[in-house]
Amino acid sequence: IANPDMAQQQNEQVAQQSVSHPALASKRGMQALSDSGRGIPLLYSEIANKVNNAKDKPRKLKVLQDNDSVALRQVLRGAFDPKIEWAIPKGDVPYAVNEAPVGTDHTILSQEAKKLYMFVKGGDNTIKQSQRELIFIQMLEGLSAEEAEFLITVVNQKVNNKYKGFTANLVKEAFDWDDNFMKKEKKPSFPV
């Protein structure tokens, strides 16, 4: 559909651009978000680095709370909940690192998080293990190098080894979770 505010040549260029996966963040899309005044959400690897670099616990908590989302909670639960067993072998993963600069064409973990159930034991038993591992490798190859590395630390449940002070207790406190990584139930302040 032609935009009446654009010159004819610009409309033709837009029409010629290929339609890509909705989870891809193109340079043009990132610029449009920036120009619209909407903040561009941080990559999860950037959030982890901010937690790592925060000087004290209150600042670490603030980083997590400021970037709170359902997808971030899902990823961090997978990183720290000992009841979650990943169906992906632990350790290094043989994948081709996406060398595209951050902010150019690659998928982002916040949008890929909804697929993580496929890589958890009991999440999707219809997928053969070889296919599961291939899908995981493809996911890693679509992410920026930093986010892929972060996802590998999540699956290996070694986030605290790489990011100082990024612990299960910090995450539970930030999101008001109990020891089962669930939202704490509010007790009524009056007798029932």
Which residues fall in each region the model found?
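N-terminal nucleic-acid-engaging modules of covalent nucleotidyltransferase systems
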Residues: 1-192
